[in-house]
Structure formats: C-alpha cells, structure tokens
C-alpha cells in the first residue's frame, strides 16, 4: 500500500510549528514494569506529550471543537452499543455534563496538539513512513484481519487519507522516541 507524501497529507492539516526541534527530554521513572514493547509504547506516548507542549502558531479553535465533538460522538456510539445512553453512563459515574464537556475539551486539545506536533516534527526531519510502518498500523487496528481492513480502506478515500496521516504521525513518533533523551 502506498502512502501519500507529507506535502499531500499536510494539505488538510494546519501547519503548526514547534518552538524547538531539539530532542525531547523524558523520564521513564513512572513507566509501568512491562515488556519491552509496552515500555516502547509508553516512551512514545510520553515523548509525544512532551513535544505537544512546544506547539506554537495560530490554530483555529474550530479544530479543537471538531476533535471534542468526535470524542463525544464516539462515546455516545459506545454507550448505545452497550444498550445505554451517554447521559446514563455519566450519571452512573457521577460526572456532570459540564465536567464531561471540559474533560473532552482537554482531551481533544491534547490530541490535536500531539498530532500537530508530530506533523511539524515529520516536516522538519523529512520523515516518511515505511511500508513496515503502514503494516504495523494496520495490524494494530485490526489484528488478524489486516487484509479485510486494507480492502475496506481502499474503497474510502477519506479513511485512506486518515490512515496516511496516522501512519506518518506514527513514523514521526517513532523517530521522536528514538531521539529522546531519557533522564
């Protein structure tokens, strides 16, 4: 499967920049004791959170609002799949609608900033995902059903573009974690 190059993928993403392109400094002191693969995932997550703090530029607030709406829509669909409503789930968890909206807004902000930071990192370092990166992403999305997912994605241009963005960010995140200074 071919991925789009960064220029094509970036056409639909704001061009945020970073205040610094130096390697991030991270601590693994709080990392759970786990297998090497889980530790590497933790390292990538911590590195992306650290990098997200460097995002600068004028980011349209609508991007954050759209991401929060997506999170809320997904939560509503999950609630319905469980035979309940989001409102009922919030009541069960003693979370007010106002608290939930603030939580999802913060989650969306973190998610958007991490994505934009990884985009900027990829642009700066000229990172392009490998075929292996594409397959790892597909495997993580549908373990054991990779072929079916590839066929499904090839029929939907929007999903294919979303996959291209995700794979490019995954490759950037791998590079970021590999260059991180662990303290």
Spell out what each predicted region is.
Residues 1-183:
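FKBP-type peptidyl-prolyl cis-trans isomerases
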């Amino acid at each position: 499967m071919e991925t789009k190059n960064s220029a094509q993928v970036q056409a639909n993403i704001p061009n945020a920049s970073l205040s610094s392109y130096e390697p991030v400094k991270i601590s693994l002191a709080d990392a759970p004791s786990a297998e090497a693969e889980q530790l590497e995932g933790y390292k990538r997550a911590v590195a992306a959170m650290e990098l997200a703090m460097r995002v600068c530029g004028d980011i349209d607030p609508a991007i954050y609002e759209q991401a929060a709406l997506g999170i809320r829509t997904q939560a509503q669909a999950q609630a319905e799949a469980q035979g309940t409503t989001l409102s009922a789930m919030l009541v069960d968890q003693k979370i007010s609608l106002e608290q939930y909206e603030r939580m999802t807004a913060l989650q969306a902000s973190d998610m958007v900033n991490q994505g934009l930071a990884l985009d900027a990192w990829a642009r700066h370092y000229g990172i392009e995902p490998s075929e292996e990166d594409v397959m790892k992403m597909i495997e993580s999305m549908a373990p054991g059903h990779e072929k079916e997912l590839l066929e499904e994605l090839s029929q939907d241009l929007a999903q294919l573009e979303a996959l291209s963005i995700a794979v490019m960010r995954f490759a950037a995140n791998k590079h970021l974690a590999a260059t991180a200074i662990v303290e």
